Amino acid sequence: APWLVPSQITTCCGYNPGTMCPSCMCTNTC
């Protein structure tokens, strides 16, 4: 189900940090 797929920011900063994008995206330091 689509709503079970984590958003990019959630995947970065939530369940799997750094998996989908740089960790700087979590702190707006990119």
Swiss-Prot record:
GO terms for cellular component: extracellular region; host cell presynaptic membrane. It comes from the Eukaryota. Keywords: Disulfide bond, Glycoprotein, Hydroxylation, Ion channel impairing toxin, Neurotoxin, Presynaptic neurotoxin, Secreted, Toxin, Voltage-gated sodium channel impairing toxin. It is found in: Secreted. Disulfide bonds join C12-C21, C13-C26, C24-C30. O-glycosylated at Ser-7 by a core type 9 glycan, containing both D- and L-galactose units (alpha-L-Galp-(1->4)-alpha-D- GlcpNAc-(1->6)-[alpha-L-Galp-(1->2)-bets-D-Galp-(1->3)-]alpha-D-GalpNAc-(1->O)). Expressed by the venom duct. Glycans are attached at S7. Its main location: secreted. GO terms for molecular function: sodium channel regulator activity; toxin activity. Signal peptide: none annotated. May specifically activate neuronal voltage-gated sodium channels (Nav) at the resting membrane potential. Causes a marked contraction and extension of the caudal and dorsal fins in fish and noticeable spontaneous contractions of isolated frog neuromuscular preparations. The cysteine framework is IV (CC-C-C-C-C). Found in both injectable (milked) (IV) and dissected venom (DV). This is Conotoxin CcTx. It comes from Conus consors. The lineage of its organism: Eukaryota, Metazoa, Spiralia, Lophotrochozoa, Mollusca.
